């Protein structure tokens, strides 16, 4: 196991998001079951931490951008900086929605349509951000998620305000369409993994990659779909489960997503103005980590060890030739020794 290879593609931004969502879902399940009696402002603490890190990271990155104009000419620096600003704008709208949700739950004095208003603005902004991201070859997962769920946001707000009286199974029809697409993606990876396993022309590394992708998508999509079905059945009154068993599949999906962040790219380098990979940044701050980052473990059979211990004979060395005038030492390669040309005397005419 090579620790350097494990952490070189680590994505700290996504790891932070998934970790905060996992902790928030745990606290929310405990609060809904009455195990803890915290205020919802405290239950949303992981969400506040997530948004705080986004705001601080963007502020520091903007300060570094403003104080160092020479950085703007480095490759795709402008594209990454604009991507960071787009992400900050969307996160601020999400923060407004989350604050309104907490206020609505604690006081209950305004309509849910007003609470969901920031999400109604997020969706068109996310569509524009997705178009911009496709043009500049940027991956915008959060923006895509917000843009495709605009109809779902409207249905949920109308159902909570009792403007429509549909069962939750019907309200979540846009969600079922999205999950059907994700199930097709899982099926695609499974089929390709089987084909790569049966093919003899594919190297082992490609087989492992496709199998890992198939297992990862299965571990993400199947528990997530299970969680959504259990939650909808509970809201419709078809089961009497407590919230903790319902949230367990969601926790499994989030843990899998956290594990996948170790094999993805490092994300935007302008967060906190570090301008480099996160692991390289940590190694520069904490030099003692380099000793552990350079450790790798390699398991061999005994036959391989005996083969490695056998010394390899070195080729014979030929003594160097010296030229006195130029004072240059020339070392001849083994088996390619060439005699020097004979001395040529040129007589000058009288």
Curated annotation (Swiss-Prot):
Domain of life of the organism encoding this protein: Eukaryota
Subcellular location field: Cell projection, Dendrite; Membrane
Membrane topology listed for this record: Multi-pass membrane protein
Main location: other
InterPro entries according to UniProt: TM_Fragile-X-F-assoc (IPR019396)
Matches recorded under Pfam families: Tmemb_185A
Sorted UniProt keywords: Cell projection, Membrane, Transmembrane, Transmembrane helix
Region (Mediates interaction with MAP1B): 298-350
One Gene Ontology cellular component: membrane
Membrane-spanning parts: 16-36, 41-61, 81-101, 111-131, 177-197, 211-231, 240-260
Assembly mode: Interacts with MAP1B.
Family the entry assigns: Belongs to the TMEM185 family.
Protein name: Transmembrane protein 185A
Gene this chain is encoded by: TMEM185A
């Amino acid at each position: 196991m090579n620790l350097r290879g494990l952490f070189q593609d680590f994505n700290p931004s996504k790891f932070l998001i998934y970790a905060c969502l996992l902790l928030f879902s745990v606290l929310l399940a405990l609060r809904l079951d009455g195990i803890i009696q915290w205020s919802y402002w405290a239950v949303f603490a992981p969400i506040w931490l997530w948004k705080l890190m986004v705001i601080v990271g963007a502020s520091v990155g903007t300060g570094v951008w403003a104080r160092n104009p020479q950085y703007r000419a480095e490759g795709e620096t402008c594209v990454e900086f604009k991507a960071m600003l787009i992400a900050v704008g969307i996160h601020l709208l999400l923060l407004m929605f989350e604050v309104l949700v907490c206020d609505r739950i604690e006081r209950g004095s305004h309509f849910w349509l007003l609470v969901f208003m920031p999400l109604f603005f997020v969706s068109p902004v996310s569509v524009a951000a997705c178009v911009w991201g496709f043009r500049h070859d940027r991956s915008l997962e959060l923006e895509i998620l917000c843009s495709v769920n605009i109809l779902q946001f409207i249905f949920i707000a109308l159902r909570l305000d009792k403007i429509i009286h549909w069962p939750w199974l019907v309200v979540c029809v846009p969600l079922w369409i999205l999950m059907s697409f994700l199930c097709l993606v899982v099926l695609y990876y499974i089929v390709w993994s089987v084909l790569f396993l049966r093919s003899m022309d594919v190297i082992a590394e490609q087989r492992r990659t496709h199998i890992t992708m198939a297992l990862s998508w299965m571990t993400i999509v199947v528990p997530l779909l299970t969680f959504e079905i259990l939650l909808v059945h509970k809201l419709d009154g078809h089961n009497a489960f407590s919230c903790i068993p319902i949230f367990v599949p969601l926790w499994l999906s989030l843990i899998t997503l956290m594990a996948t962040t170790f094999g993805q790219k490092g994300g935007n380098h302008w967060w906190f103005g570090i301008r480099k990979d996160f692991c390289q940044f940590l190694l520069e701050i904490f030099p003692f980590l380099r000793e552990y980052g350079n450790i790798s473990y390699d398991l061999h059979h005994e036959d391989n060890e005996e083969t490695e211990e056998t010394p390899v004979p070195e080729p014979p060395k030929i003594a160097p030739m010296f030229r006195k005038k130029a004072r240059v030492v020339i070392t001849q390669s083994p088996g390619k020794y060439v005699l020097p040309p004979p001395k040529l005397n040129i007589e000058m005419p009288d």
